[in-house]
Amino acid sequence: MSGTLGIAIQPLRVADSNAEAVRLTEYWSARCEGRAMPARRDLDVVEMRDWLGRLSLYEVLGDGDMWCRLRGSTMCTIPVPGHDSDGVLVSRTQPHSFAEMGLRHYAETHALAEPTCYRIELSFDGLTYRYDRLALPLASDGVLRPMVMTFIKCDVRRARAFWERYQEAGLALTS
């Protein structure tokens, strides 16, 4: 058994991702209303119901870290070590290489002030799973910090099995 998490990352045009990511990006673009990006208050959760379970919100802290403000209900069923449903620093997610990959993607999205999308493949102990992660920047509204909203498209059953195997190997807190 290898104790190393393999991470392969491929930049992806949103149009080459999946129909749900395309529709969410169109929704986000419509909320810009002439600005570089919308703020969280510009988004209506009722209009976003098709995506809610796979959305997460990350607050930009300004020190290179992000605070997981909200993790979608579907995403909460995937046992990523150290990545609770909300109220956790992304840097505390395990393994560290996985946290760093997420932080780079979120920081890039915030800095570019435009949607970014990646196809990510994780491998460990002969098991792999692939997912697309769309990240959309959200401006500060003067009260809330700027945020990055993510949408994940994956095989949830496979993702659960992957992270469960990773944790069973006892690597969740040592990688």
Roles of regions detected by a PLM:
Residues 1-93, 97-175:
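Intrinsically disordered, low-complexity terminal regulatory regions
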